[in-house]
């Protein structure tokens, strides 16, 4: 990963105003910080959230709280709990989408 030039920066994620993103069911709240071409996010998924799209973008995703299920278009599923992560490159595998039955808080770099 090539990180863009950036000064040392502490971030208070609770101070960033969230944007709401409805899913097919439930919703996601994104708190976003853009640093050059890198996007940092703290994302909160409501219980019952299902993404409204399939994604081919690369990510590093770390589960802070709750439980996240990632489904790949080829039928594979992976469930992550707090303290677990996954990473995938742009177009690195079949497209994926996220869901959660209980809600989840994530830290995402893409």
Report residues per predicted region.
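A short, N-terminal "cap"/entry segment at the start of jelly-roll beta-barrel domains
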Residues: 1-42
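Short acidic-glycine-tyrosine-enriched beta hairpin
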Residues: 74-91
């Amino acid at each position: 990963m090539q990180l863009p030039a950036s000064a040392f920066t502490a971030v208070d994620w609770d101070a960033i105003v969230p944007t709401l993103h409805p899913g097919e069911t439930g919703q996601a709240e994104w708190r976003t910080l853009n640093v050059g071409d890198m996007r940092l996010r703290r994302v909160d998924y409501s219980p019952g959230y299902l993404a409204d799209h399939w994604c081919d973008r690369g990510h590093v995703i770390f589960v802070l709280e709750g439980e996240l299920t990632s489904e790949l278009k080829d039928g594979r599923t992976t469930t992550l709990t707090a303290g677990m992560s996954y990473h995938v490159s742009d177009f690195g595998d079949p497209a994926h989408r996220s869901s959660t039955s209980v809600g989840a808080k994530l830290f995402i770099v893409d």
